[in-house]
Amino acid sequence: MKIDKRLMVIVAIATLFRMIPFRLKYLVGSDPYFHLAYIEEALKAGEWFNFFTYAGGPWGLQVRLFHPLGLWATPAYIYKLFSFLGISLYTAFRVTPVIFGVLTVVFFYLSLKKLYNRDVAFIVGLFLGVNYGHIFRSMANYYRGDNYMLFWYSVALLGIALGLKTRSKYRYLFYLLPGIATGFASAFWQAYYPIFVFVLAGGLLLGVYAYLKSPKLFLDSILIVLSTGLGVLIANILGDKVGYGMLGYTDWMGKKVAETFGLEFGFIKDAYLLIHVKYLLPLSLVFLGFLIITKKLNPKIKVGVLVGGSILAFIVMLVKFPALKDLSTGFGTFREVPISETLPPTLDDLWRAYNIAIFLAALYILRLRKIRSGDAILLGYVITSLWMLRYWTRFLFTAAPAVAFLSGIGVYELTRRIKENKIRITSLGVVILLSSAFSLGEVYSVKPFMNENWEKALIFIRENSNENDIVLTWWDWGHFVTYYARRSPVAQGSPNSGVAGYYLGLVDNGWAQSLGVDYVIVSLYDILKFEAIVDTAKLSRKWENISRADYGVDFLKLTESTGSILRFDSQYSTLIVKEGNIRVILSGKVVYPREAIIESNGRIKNLKYPARSGVYVYVNLDYGYAILANEKAWETNLLRLFTQRTGENYELVYSDGGFVKVFRFVHPNVVFRGNKFILTGNGTGLGLYGYLDNGTLVFKKWYSVKNMQEFELPNNLNGSVVVRYVYTQGKIVLDRGIVRVKN
């Protein structure tokens, strides 16, 4: 077997770029920490259990309602496969994204080699190998599920390429591969659905190509479209085994989308799969049938028929099925949620992801004079992925190969017109080096959110709290709590308006008590997200009228230190500290704060002034920063706790002096130890709800515990593996949580 040296070069470059973050001690982002925590606990338990008690506090989290099992099983089996080499699970987990990211590049290379030629494949492979938009979610230390979807699409594309270009009477069998790939993609990520659209769009555009230029390819087009039906069948079968996607029949989003489209779950138990089978697949076949019927028309008339028919079909589809207009945005999912991933990309986002490839993509126009069947297939993916990119920054990754295809093919078309071989090679080298340099800078600039400050604080909680304790922290850090503290956070993975309201002081301690909160984390990182906290609180109708303008918070860095004089600056204000005398310069006007808190060497010094400025100041001398706030922000729970102006319900148990602080929330509490509930406070009732691992409620009973200090778990819980408990005094909830029952 002859070694493809060009492919080896691409593999080496793609691997090198994606392994750069491996040098980092911590994982990138926050989601990977949840995934790794679950894998570790599952391997420890010896089974892929469903009910995870270290997440989703105080209720617990059913992981089968989160992602399909393949997302967690893959790194685990890679670890088991290579454990004989002495690699740890942590290492295996960190390199898994690289493995599938590089494999994606490889399969795209092989596909383009079939659809075009080895030169096109090589240039596109180089562009994709150094494309930061693709690197970001396929690099070491950053484990994300969409990496698998693009991998399976690259497999599907290879199957289509083999079907189109193989000279054999059995070539049509290759069209089983896109069906298998789309189906298997469902086992690895909850939002795998775009792969169906990519394959379907490719089949439809191949049908258009067949209509205009090569009628013999109609059968290929139909088989590609039908392959997605096989994918639906496989995805539906796998769903019963490893869990459905985010539009599954047990998920609230799946129920909502099904209701919107007037669908009922039956044999097919996923809303998107139902939409695909009931609407997208039949409509696509009708469209292809229309093209086949009119294929013998005059070529000029055919163009008019195609354009007019497409417009008419699009209008009819939107009138008859108006909800389909939201298909590209996940049916409106997260439309109002303040997450950067679900906002449209900015020009800066596009430049960071693709750099010069954005401009080089325009060169694809040189290819339009001689469109071939391979172009039709690729354009199906390119058009749909770029359309998705209009809506969400998240799709910078999904569209990365599309940009690489356009720019790579465009550069090939340009350079092949250059007759001088040295100039052609030099030009290509300069372009690739430029793109590589920009991407290299972006990869090296990647920094984890996790750091030693967080790690020490969370390990403290793990070592000094009870297993059933609940932790309140901002949702961005919730997965950190699950991994390092092995405790259940109230919010993680998605915005929580209740937690935002708590930090802003819009709810009282009774709210936290009703959720069983035992520890509250406040940090400088939360204060830096103050505007996001306000925006998240506004998601609740109760607080939709609050405004960022109501809460004034400014972060200032130490910029000058001369003797006893310290100067702190931000874009908007200046703070001068001199021997306890503090002045604030706002818009050129000098004012004095009403209250100032100075933290240094673990001590808090509170200074009050007879000023009426409405300005409040926190100064941290150890870490060299200051916080400026107006009265409304100053009196929020977040700043009251961070500046240690707490009431009797909060006890500071950990502080690093200025980054992360942990408070124990003092309230009537339940501790689960040795199959016994140890009760504190004057509670009168204890409700127990037992569940099987699949989430079925099999036990429910209330007990009177008045004047009791402990309560032993009943022996017969009807096979329950986890128990949710509620500790009450009359109708008031004193504590709440979830425990795993030990045999």
UniProtKB/Swiss-Prot annotation:
Site (Important for catalytic activity): R137
Chain positions of motif TIXE motif: 333-336
Ligand binding (a glycophospholipid): R394
Site feature Interacts with target acceptor peptide in protein substrate, where: D31, E336, K529
Stretches assigned to the Extracellular side: 29-91, 141-144, 238-272, 324-345, 392-394, 446-743
Membrane disposition: Multi-pass membrane protein
Motif (WWDYG motif): 474-478
Motif (DXD motif 1): 29-31
Pathway membership, UniProt: Protein modification; protein glycosylation
Annotated motif DK motif, positions: 526-533
Disulfide bonds: none
Keywords noted in UniProt: Cell membrane, Glycosyltransferase, Magnesium, Manganese, Membrane, Metal-binding, Transferase, Transmembrane, Transmembrane helix
Catalytic activity: an archaeal dolichyl phosphooligosaccharide + [protein]-L-asparagine = an archaeal dolichyl phosphate + a glycoprotein with the oligosaccharide chain attached by N-beta-D-glycosyl linkage to a protein L-asparagine
Cofactor(s) needed for function: Mn(2+); Mg(2+)
Family that this chain belongs to: Belongs to the STT3 family.
Main function: Oligosaccharyl transferase (OST) that catalyzes the initial transfer of a defined glycan (ManNAcXyl(2)GlcAMan(2)GalNAc in P.furiosus) from the lipid carrier dolichol-monophosphate to an asparagine residue within an Asn-X-Ser/Thr consensus motif in nascent polypeptide chains, the first step in protein N-glycosylation.
Protein name: Dolichyl-phosphooligosaccharide-protein glycotransferase 2
Protein source organism: Pyrococcus furiosus (strain ATCC 43587 / DSM 3638 / JCM 8422 / Vc1)
